[in-house]
Regions:
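Short, ordered loop/turn segments at secondary-structure junctions
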Residues: 102-103, 120
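Active-site-proximal, substrate-binding regions of enzyme catalytic domains
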Residues: 2-95, 102, 113, 140, ...
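Glycine/proline-rich loop-helix segments at beta-alpha junctions forming the active-site rim
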Residues: 107
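Hydrophobic alpha-helical interaction segments
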Residues: 117, 121-163
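A short alpha->loop->secondary-structure connector
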Residues: 110-116
Length: 164
């Protein structure tokens, strides 16, 4: 059974959301947000304590998955242990993976996981009226000005649609 209301996140997503000024608003979505317990020490901006207070939950890897993480890490050196832990948790829960890392996105897609990024999350925030379209456009512009690397065609399409 797929846990479609559960989103397993990497750390990049939270940085983009903070840069966009919409960290609080994302928790207005009807999703449960999980991140690997490995990520706690990486979440210094935004701080783990803030994210936890807003609703982000940490998820431990099952012991059997820790061994698999070691093998995955050897085969995917460009990905961090935290990124691979997010992948393994999403796969184990049959949940959706949210990532800002194209390498992790590729790995997830090749393994049949549902995977999305911050643009999808912005779409969901507009769809569920957690933010207005104009607010989404402003947040996206802030993310881009802070160095977010997003598919140009995709973000331009959204900016055009949300700014009208």
């Amino acid at each position: 059974m797929a846990l479609q209301s559960v989103l397993v996140t990497d750390t990049n997503i939270w940085i983009d959301l903070e840069n966009g000024g919409i960290l609080t608003e994302v928790f207005g979505l009807p999703y449960q947000f999980l991140t690997p317990d490995f990520a706690i020490r990486e979440l210094v901006r935004p701080k783990w304590q803030l994210l936890q207070a807003l609703g982000l939950q940490s998820q431990e890897l099952e012991p059997a998955l820790i061994q698999e993480l070691t093998h995955l890490r050897a085969a995917n050196r460009a990905l961090s242990a935290t990124d691979l832990a997010a992948f393994l948790i999403a796969r184990a829960l049959d949940a959706t993976l949210l990532t800002g890392d194209w390498r992790l996105n590729d790995l997830a897609a090749k393994n049949g996981l549902r995977v999305h990024g911050v643009l999808w999350l912005l779409d969901e925030m507009v769809r569920f009226r957690a933010i207005a379209p104009e607010h989404a456009a402003n947040a996206l512009n802030q993310m881009l000005s802070q160095g977010a690397r997003l598919p140009q065609d995709e973000y331009r399409k959204r900016l055009a649609g949300w700014s009208t």
